[in-house]
């Protein structure tokens, strides 16, 4: 069968128009290969068909820089969407939006390829059972439990520890559950992507993860598709290898932002705040594929940037409607030196429900939140009048709240190199038992410092015993 070849008729930024012979128009979302003129390592420039303009012309979005393209150049229709390498060969590797390795470790040796555009699983294939995914991080497991096959948003500013929590989760899932992680760097800083790769390599978790990067310097076409490339990788592990997969997306906002950049070039009328009119469809198409099926699950953690801290902005507002829970990182808590700096009162989870997590877990979690909320309410009084003016009951509440606050901190495996403290994975039942004990006053004789940066309650008791012996 002879190749279907068209010719470039127009180039506007990241958008390329190609004319094909009559009756041979490529399908929407098909990939076209153009011999790469800008002398980069990649032999072809890949473009994705976005529109049929009439007169046998298609409008495409380029997945790489379009410098050096001229009218009359040949574009070959591949007849299928962008296909990316999947499976075991992709683990421990970094690839770009079209599945080419960018880690200078040679080609990805596999015969398994999947298209990046795939339908979401049918209702009949979806698993409706709600299960909790244990992460081994106390504050997450107790107060913001992760649903298996659910979607969690990670909200936080710069430098409060989003990446460290992501890495710890990748580490814990890999070691405890033997699970596989896929990391999608969507429009993030190249430096951060580089740091993540080397940190994961040093922490020994790289062999259980596939990294797919489309950084800030990439054209919008690549940034708008790189999340789908990562998703295709994750879907293979879920559907073919029957695995439970973790999909990390940093940052989901950049996916929307890239879509809005190409939207105007495609001649679409902008909607609110200049976003693409197809915002809901674009995001829905991505999010609906992230789900649990009868074969396996994809659990997703998505970092969400909130433009100008405005949660009503269309991009974060649309993202919210898809999430099962929010993990909010707070600068105030990070300033106290409590890591992970999760805000226990601002974070929410859909499955913190007695029918899912059980009455014991639910009652402990709610009691912890009540004590912390009471402490927060009393802080103004303490600041003005001091602790002595509080009633005995309030003094006890404050003492327990401060113990709880410190016990919510935890040493991480991936941070061992710079904390010098070995990381700890805490089982959920141990977490619940320990917090129940603190609430009941079983550990009122321990000092606040005994609870800081420990894993289980046994370590806190050991600290106390050591101190007693020294005295």
From Swiss-Prot:
A molecular function (GO) held by this record is: ATP hydrolysis activity
Keyword annotations: ATP synthesis, ATP-binding, Cell inner membrane, Cell membrane, CF(1), Hydrogen ion transport, Ion transport, Membrane, Nucleotide-binding, Translocase, Transport
From the record, give the cysteines joined by S-S bonds: none
Q: Which SMART domains match?
A: AAA
According to UniProt, the reaction catalysed is: ATP + H2O + 4 H(+)(in) = ADP + phosphate + 5 H(+)(out)
What EC number(s) does this enzyme carry? 7.1.2.2
EC class:
translocase
Top-level taxon of origin: Bacteria
Localisation per UniProt entry: Cell inner membrane
Q: Which GO terms describe its cellular component?
A: plasma membrane; proton-transporting ATP synthase complex
Membrane topology type, per the record? Peripheral membrane protein
| SUPFAM superfamilies with a match to the protein in the record | C-terminal domain of alpha and beta subunits of F1 ATP synthase, N-terminal domain of alpha and beta subunits of F1 ATP synthase, P-loop containing nucleoside triphosphate hydrolases
**One Pfam family of this protein, by short name?**
ATP-synt_VA_C
Report residues binding ATP: 156-163
Subunit text: F-type ATPases have 2 components, CF(1) - the catalytic core - and CF(0) - the membrane proton channel. CF(1) has five subunits: alpha(3), beta(3), gamma(1), delta(1), epsilon(1). CF(0) has three main subunits: a(1), b(2) and c(9-12). The alpha and beta chains form an alternating ring which encloses part of the gamma chain. CF(1) is attached to CF(0) by a central stalk formed by the gamma and epsilon chains, while a peripheral stalk is formed by the delta and b chains.
**What does the sequence similarity comment in the record state about its family?**
Belongs to the ATPase alpha/beta chains family.
Q: What does this protein do?
A: Produces ATP from ADP in the presence of a proton gradient across the membrane. The catalytic sites are hosted primarily by the beta subunits.
Q: What is this protein called?
A: ATP synthase subunit beta
Q: Which organism is it from?
A: Nitratidesulfovibrio vulgaris (strain DSM 19637 / Miyazaki F)
Lineage start: Bacteria, Pseudomonadati, Thermodesulfobacteriota, Desulfovibrionia, Desulfovibrionales
């Amino acid at each position: 069968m002879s190749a279907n070849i068209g010719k470039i008729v127009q180039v506007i930024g990241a958008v390329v128009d190609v004319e094909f012979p009559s009756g041979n128009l490529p399908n929407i979302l098909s990939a076209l290969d153009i011999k790469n003129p800008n002398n980069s390592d990649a032999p072809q420039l890949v473009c994705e068909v976005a529109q049929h303009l009439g007169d046998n012309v298609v409008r495409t979005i380029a997945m790489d820089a379009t410098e050096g393209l001229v009218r009359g150049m040949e574009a070959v229709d591949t007849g299928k969407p962008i296909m990316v390498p999947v499976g075991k060969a992709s683990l421990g590797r970094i690839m770009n939006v079209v599945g080419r390795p960018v880690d200078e470790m040679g080609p990805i040796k596999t015969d398994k390829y999947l298209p990046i555009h795939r339908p979401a699983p049918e209702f009949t294939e979806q698993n409706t059972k709600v299960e909790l995914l244990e992460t081994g991080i106390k504050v997450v497991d107790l107060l913001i439990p992760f649903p298996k096959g659910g979607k969690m948003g990670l909200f936080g500013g710069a430098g409060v520890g989003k990446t460290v929590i992501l890495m710890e989760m990748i580490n814990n899932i890999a070691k405890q559950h033997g699970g596989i992680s896929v990391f999608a760097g969507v429009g993030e800083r190249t430096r951060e992507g580089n740091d993540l790769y080397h940190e994961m390599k040093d922490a020994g978790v790289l062999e259980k993860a596939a990294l797919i990067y489309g950084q800030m310097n990439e054209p919008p076409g690549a940034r708008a598709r790189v999340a789908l490339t990562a998703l295709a990788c994750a879907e293979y592990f879920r559907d073919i290898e029957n695995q439970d997969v973790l999909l990390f997306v940093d940052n989901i906002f950049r996916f929307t932002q890239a879509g809005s950049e190409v939207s105007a070039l495609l001649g679409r009328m902008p909607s609110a705040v200049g976003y693409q009119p197809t915002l809901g469809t674009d995001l829905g198409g991505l999010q609906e594929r992230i789900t649990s099926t009868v074969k396996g699950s994809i659990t997703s953690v998505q970092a969400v940037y909130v433009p100008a801290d405005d949660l009503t902005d269309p991009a974060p507002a649309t993202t919210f409607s898809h999430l099962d829970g929010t993990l909010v990182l707070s600068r105030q808590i990070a300033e106290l030196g409590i890591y992970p700096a999760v805000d226990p009162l601002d974070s929410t989870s859909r499955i913190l429900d007695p029918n899912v997590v059980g009455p014991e877990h639910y009652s402990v979690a709610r009691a912890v939140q009540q004590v912390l909320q009471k402490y927060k309410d009393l802080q103004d009084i303490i600041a003005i009048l001091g602790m002595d003016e509080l009633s005995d009951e309030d003094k006890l509440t404050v003492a327990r709240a401060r113990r709880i606050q410190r016990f919510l901190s935890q040493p991480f495996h991936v941070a061992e190199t710079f904390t010098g403290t070995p990381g700890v994975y805490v089982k959920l039942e141990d977490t619940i038992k320990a917090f129940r004990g603190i609430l009941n006053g079983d550990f009122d004789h321990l000092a606040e410092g005994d609870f800081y940066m420990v894993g289980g309650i046994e370590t806190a008791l050991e600290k106390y015993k050591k101190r007693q012996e020294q005295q």
